[in-house]
Amino acid sequence: MFIAAKYIHQKIKSRNKNPNDDALKHATEKKPCPHSRPFQVELRARASVENARTSSQGSTIEEDRVLVPQGLPKSDEKCQVCKKQKHDARVYRWKLIAGLCLPFILATLDLTIVATALPSIASHFNEFDELNWIVTAFTLTSTTFIPMFGQFADVFGRGETLHLSLFLMIIGSVLCAAAQTWGMLLLGRALQGVSDAGLMNVVMIILSDKVSLKESAKTKSLFTLVGGIGYAVGPTVGGCKTSTNIAVIAHILVFILLRHELVEGTMFKKGSRLSGILPALATVDIIGSILFIFGVGLIILATAWGGATYSWSAAQVLAPLVVGSICFVLFFVYEYFLEPGRIFARIFPKQIAMLPYSMFARRDTIWLAIVQFSTGAAMYSIFYYIGIYFSLVEAYPASKAGVQLLYYIPGMGVGVYIAVFLCNVWPAQSFFPLNIGTIVSTVGLAMVVYAIHTQNTSLINGMMAITGAGTGLRFMPATLHMVGVWPEKIAPAQSLMRFAQPFGGTLSLTIMGSVFNNKFARASVVAGGGGLDVHDTNSLTFIADLPEEAQRSVRLAGRDAIMWAYIAVLPIMGLSLVTGLFIGNVWIRPKSKVDEEQRDGLEEEGSHSEVIYVPYLWALLKGNVDSYKKTNKIIPESTSKSAGFNNS
């Protein structure tokens, strides 16, 4: 009788039950962590067998009544493994911040650290006509060696490559500080450029290792701000001894904090003997590296000489331009035949391509490289030619002209902050900050042209801030997007992005220099100045000795020359506007598929990234974005010493 009454009560209760209660309960109940999922599967299987057995015997045992094995966390308890993972993740993040901030600041400092000292350095060596080589020696090597350091990071390990970069910085800084000849100074600057290529590239690779895109976005947000600070304070803390001191401290911090945390090399691992260096070098793409260095280096050299030192039709310009272009094309041909199964891969079976040709099969690689190229063009043009404008046209002293650049840095900071929100909070995607940043930079740089034409100082300062905001908007999303597109090729993907930015800046500077010299040369000769070197700030003093009318003519000619120099780089910005429309999208915090998997306890949060390889706007027009989405699973890094980190 008691059993029958209980049965009737349960039937009435189930009949009156709100059908939405189960859905609400399912939505609000705490999802099982991935570590308890195997136990949950076992429990469900055991329950189904038990229910099938007892139902055949007419038992009234409740269907969901299953004992939890000992040691399995209950619903209201926190999994100890999850707690340890979160703790390890927090410790790892702070180790990265403490260990890599100084190397990253050092890399950004060296781009502008000698800016205010250029006139005095050149006068010391009596080389005013070669002043531009203090900058060119650095930018040339810092651009050409970026992909090589990316491959070194893969073959020899992140830590060893980072220490090598810091060591080269110490040697280069010592040579600069102790330089007795002009050649010795340029050698030191060239070594600093090689070091900068390694530091910038390896730090970005490390920040992408062993973490999800969501976690990487948080850390890279901070380092983007740190980089902006480095660019800003470089001219004020100028001096090669500063670089030496920072490099020594960075060496120590990296060794103490990160020696057990960084990803090991594929060939040269921790504990390997020195005899293992040669077998590891055998896997490096030596021929590709040589072709790339000569190709890019000669192209930069030709554009630096063309229109400034020699005419564009001179053999000194045409020879390096033609040879460099041939080497650059041959590099991509060689990388194509170094793909697995092709002829060079069979001849050199151990070698690994520096920039695998297969990377360009996904079009976002090309579009992103163009966007990064334009980012470098916008940034370098502001850093160098705004100072020339205020010195030449507005007759500001060098110190005051340098202060005007500070308007660019707050704008960059605002852009970085907006990018942090767009990547980490809403909409947590890369497409929107990349395109918004491109639009803002293009509009800002175009308005700089107008402001220079009208000689409106307030408008110039405001547009510098706007351009800086556009630059800051693109820094972090570009690296996150590339990692999302190529999670299995982090080092070469990051190397390509790190190369495109300074390459765009360096080529843009040489183009602007050629345009400026050609436009301004006639006016300065007519005014009796005998010509003006764009990089020689000391030669600007000749204007003050001219008659007032001649001064006005020369300064107006300088204004127009600088305006046309900026107009010359606007097509690069326009090209990036168009290519931005063809970029796909990466969901840094994917929701749909991951949430479903979390309900079943399959994966941890942030262990997936979702990406669209076709143009995102095309997917929107088709009205079915989800059908184009691909899920990139984050593969756990086996070499990690810390639990809970995945290789994005």
Give the label of every model feature segment.
Residues 146-287:
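Helix-loop-helix hairpins in multi-pass membrane proteins, especially solute transporters
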Residues 1-92, 257-277, 347, 529-537, ...:
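Intrinsically disordered, low-complexity terminal tails of fungal membrane proteins
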